[in-house]
């Protein structure tokens, strides 16, 4: 069965997020995240949080990682589930130094799907 228009739009929002990581271009992230979005994670067993604006500003130089062209950085959308105007997405970022799993909550507002919440875990790889 072909994906619904909403599933295609959710995947497009998640793809903007992935492109932001791949290119270092914050404009992709701004297309992915709602302006009021928040990020949460556990650091040393303590809840940590930041706004999407803070996250996007910390992205760095606006250029791709030095090893981006080598193909060692892998990114994929593993799951999308849409119900009405709410959706979830699971993204896996497999980098040489870390394995990251992002769980995104998305809402459709004003006809657009945006990430409104991100929780994630990072597992550093042994060198």
Residue map of PLM features:
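Short, low-complexity N-terminal intrinsically disordered segments enriched in polar/charged residues
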Residues: 1-27, 31, 35, 53
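Surface-exposed, charged secondary-structure patches
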Residues: 9, 38-99
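Short beta-strand segments enriched in hydrophobic/aromatic residues
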Residues: 33, 93, 119-120
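Short beta-strand edge/turn micro-motifs at domain boundaries
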Residues: 88, 99-126
């Amino acid at each position: 069965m072909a994906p619904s228009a909403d599933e295609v739009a959710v995947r497009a929002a998640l793809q903007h997020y992935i492109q932001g990581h791949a290119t270092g271009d914050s404009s992709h992230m701004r297309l992915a995240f709602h302006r009021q979005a928040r990020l949460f994670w556990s650091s040393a067993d303590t809840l940590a949080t930041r706004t999407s604006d803070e996250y996007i500003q910390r992205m760095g130089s606006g250029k791709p990682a030095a090893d981006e062209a080598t193909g060692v950085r892998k990114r994929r959308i593993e799951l999308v589930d849409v119900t009405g105007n709410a959706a979830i997405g699971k993204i896996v970022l497999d980098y040489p130094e870390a394995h990251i799993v992002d769980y995104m909550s998305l809402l459709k507002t004003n006809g657009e799907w945006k990430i409104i919440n991100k929780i994630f875990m990072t597992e550093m790889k042994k060198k």
